[in-house]
């Protein structure tokens, strides 16, 4: 366990909580989804460490055990935080694994910082290329009315919102694909977030356009997604990301919800570890 400090101009230091398995293995940085924390990777960290990798997780600003500043929730700043992590820990030859919202930092990283530190990347149930349906993004899977409803729901009641959100997160066609205990763990992680951060990041992942970032991905890439994902539907996200990154690999986890890392950890870990070994 450690903390790194992200610096953004004068008096803008933000401490980020980091967990690092250490060791001399090639580093894998796991970037969590909204509105969870690095603890959401507990089905992955031991398996990846056992396979010989140095596994680094961190809590995004505003979430988990990290500082919760009032500002800094654009993808440019969030990606700057990721870059600070890589430079502070002096990580090279890194695989970035971005789950859901975390795929945004992965996409934006190439545009801002290039690929010098990177070995490969994984877009896992990830939000790129662009969630919000607009006139010039007709394939966006998120309707503006849906986004407004989410914002209103979280603003009104965190308890009610996270109860419904985690149910959808882990369900396929109304059937929960994890245990109730696992769903409750996700609710507990969500409640560690600051509401202002959760709302700001909701806007960021819904409205940020990554279509110009994806062609900059210049290392091997894997897209892995559940075909029963009702939160970030595959056809409007993972399928398009795979098409936008020449040479990318695609693995669809059949019958899997958005929260596939918890519902289908054996298959998910096997596929990602096979990709990491390349």
Where are these regions (language model features)?
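Conserved alpha/beta-hydrolase catalytic His-Asp/Glu region
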Residues: 132-141, 152-215
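Short beta-strand/loop motif that positions the catalytic acidic residue
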Residues: 217, 223-225
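Conserved HGGG/HGGXW glycine-rich cap/lid loop of the alpha/beta-hydrolase fold
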Residues: 10-71, 85
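Conserved alpha/beta-hydrolase "nucleophile elbow" surrounding the catalytic nucleophile
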Residues: 32-34, 94, 98-100
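Catalytic active-site module of serine/aspartate enzymes centered on a nucleophile-bearing elbow/loop
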Residues: 246-278
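Conserved acidic catalytic loop of the alpha/beta-hydrolase fold
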Residues: 77-94
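Flexible "cap/lid" loop of the alpha/beta hydrolase fold
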Residues: 107, 111-112, 116-156
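Acidic catalytic loop of the alpha/beta-hydrolase fold
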Residues: 227-232
């Amino acid at each position: 366990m450690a903390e790194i400090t992200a610096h953004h101009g004068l008096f803008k230091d933000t401490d980020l909580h980091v967990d690092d398995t250490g060791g001399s293995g090639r580093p894998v940085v796991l970037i969590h989804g909204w509105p969870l924390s690095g603890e959401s990777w507990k089905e992955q960290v031991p398996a990846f460490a056992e396979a010989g990798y140095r596994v680094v997780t961190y809590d995004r600003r505003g979430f988990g055990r990290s500082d919760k500043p009032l500002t800094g929730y654009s993808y440019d700043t969030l990606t700057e935080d990721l870059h600070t992590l890589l430079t502070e820990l002096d990580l090279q030859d890194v695989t970035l694994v971005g789950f859901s919202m975390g795929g945004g930092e992965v996409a934006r990283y190439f545009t801002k910082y290039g690929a010098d530190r990177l070995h490969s990347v994984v877009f896992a149930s990830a939000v790129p290329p662009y969630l919000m349906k607009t006139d010039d993004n007709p394939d966006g899977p998120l309707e503006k009315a849906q986004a407004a409803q989410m914002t209103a729901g979280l603003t009104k009641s965190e308890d009610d919102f996270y109860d419904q959100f985690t149910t959808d997160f882990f369900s396929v066609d109304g059937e929960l694909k994890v245990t109730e205990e696992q769903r409750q763990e996700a609710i507990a992680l969500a409640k560690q977030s600051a509401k202002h951060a959760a709302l700001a990041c909701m806007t960021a992942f819904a409205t940020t356009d990554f279509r110009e970032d994806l062609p900059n991905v210049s290392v091997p890439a894997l897209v892995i997604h559940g075909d029963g994902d009702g939160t970030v539907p595959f056809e409007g996200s993972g399928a398009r990301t795979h098409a936008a990154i020449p040479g990318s690999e695609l693995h669809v986890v059949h019958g899997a919800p958005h929260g596939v890392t918890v519902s289908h950890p054996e298959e998910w870990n096997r596929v990602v570890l096979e990709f990491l070994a390349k």
